[in-house]
Amino acid sequence: MPRKGNIPKREVLPDPMYGSKVVTKLINNLMVDGKKGKSQRIVYDAFAIVAEKTGEEALEVFNKAMDNIMPVLEVKARRVGGANYQVPIEVRPERRQTLGLRWLVKYTRARGEKGMVEKLAKEIMDAANNTGASVKKKEDTHKMAEANKAFAHYRW
């Protein structure tokens, strides 16, 4: 553990096409083996499909999707007297975004469509309509937190 205090976080630069830091984070999450150009092309092509199919601004649809994916509560294991309890805690804003992006990419990869562009576009549109696997993951996380509400007093 470092003794010199906190290490400053590196600032994420907004992406060149939409000027959004969240889109940059999506591109970075999607990137495999350092191939950022390929990842950018996938995201921008998917956004083009989203804009074409919904008739709305792609960034607005993406932001709506992110709002529907990001969790408010999660559970954290806490050991008390030899027993492990799943303690519900609120999710910090930065972690909410990180989890939302992580789930979006994970469930995009798990989809059955042909081609990553199509998968990502469909998952974003589904999430914007409050359906899809990534939204289900958020709902499951919230259900888990709700079910373990009794252990909320173990919060630290």
Swiss-Prot record:
Keywords: Ribonucleoprotein, Ribosomal protein, RNA-binding, rRNA-binding, tRNA-binding. The keyword ATP-binding does not apply. One of its GO terms (molecular function) is tRNA binding. GO terms for biological process: translation. CDD domains: uS7_Bacteria. The keyword DNA damage does not apply. InterPro entries: Ribosomal_uS7 (IPR000235), Ribosomal_uS7_bac/org-type (IPR005717), Ribosomal_uS7_CS (IPR020606), Ribosomal_uS7_dom (IPR023798), Ribosomal_uS7_dom_sf (IPR036823). GO terms for cellular component: small ribosomal subunit. Pfam families: Ribosomal_S7. One of the primary rRNA binding proteins, it binds directly to 16S rRNA where it nucleates assembly of the head domain of the 30S subunit. Is located at the subunit interface close to the decoding center, probably blocks exit of the E-site tRNA. Part of the 30S ribosomal subunit. Contacts proteins S9 and S11. Belongs to the universal ribosomal protein uS7 family. PANTHER family: RIBOSOMAL PROTEIN S7. NCBIfam families: rpsG_bact (TIGR01029). This is Small ribosomal subunit protein uS7. It comes from Clostridioides difficile (strain 630) (Peptoclostridium difficile). The gene is rpsG.
